[in-house]
Amino acid sequence: MPRKGPVQPREISPDPVYKDVLVHKLINKVMKDGKKSKAEKIVYTAMKNLAEKTGDDPLTALHKAIENIKPVLEVRPRRVGGSTYQVPMEVPPRRQISLALRWLVEAARNRSGKGNYTMIEKLTNELFDAYNNRGAAVKKKEDTHRMAEANKAFAHYRW
């Protein structure tokens, strides 16, 4: 345990194009092997395509898509008297964003279809689906909420 108190979260600088921290976090999630310029190209093109599809501002569309993916509840394991219970808990705001971005990128990478889809097309389609409250990332959120709802009886074990 550190003696200097809780660790302060780092200040994340906004991205240069949209001047938004969420876009910067998405770029970092998409990035593989330190190839940031490639990740930026993927995200910016996907956002431009999303804006064309929705007819909305790209930043507004992204924020709405992320808002539709953010989980409010999740289950955490808690050991009580030799057995482990899945206890539903509220998700802190920072974790909501990080889970939403993780699920979005994961769903985009796992997305398949006929032909060779690029990551740009996959991310665009997944963002569009999330914008319209459907898709794999939104399903993951609903599954998480369903699991929390099913284990509501163990909510009194919260710590």
UniProtKB/Swiss-Prot annotation:
Family under the similarity heading: Belongs to the universal ribosomal protein uS7 family.
SUPFAM superfamilies, per the entry: Ribosomal protein S7 (SSF47973)
Gene Ontology process terms (BP): translation
Gene: rpsG
Protein name per Swiss-Prot or TrEMBL: Small ribosomal subunit protein uS7
Keyword Ribonucleoprotein on entry: yes
Task of the protein: One of the primary rRNA binding proteins, it binds directly to 16S rRNA where it nucleates assembly of the head domain of the 30S subunit. Is located at the subunit interface close to the decoding center, probably blocks exit of the E-site tRNA.
Key word Protein biosynthesis present: no
Annotated NCBIfam families: rpsG_bact (TIGR01029)
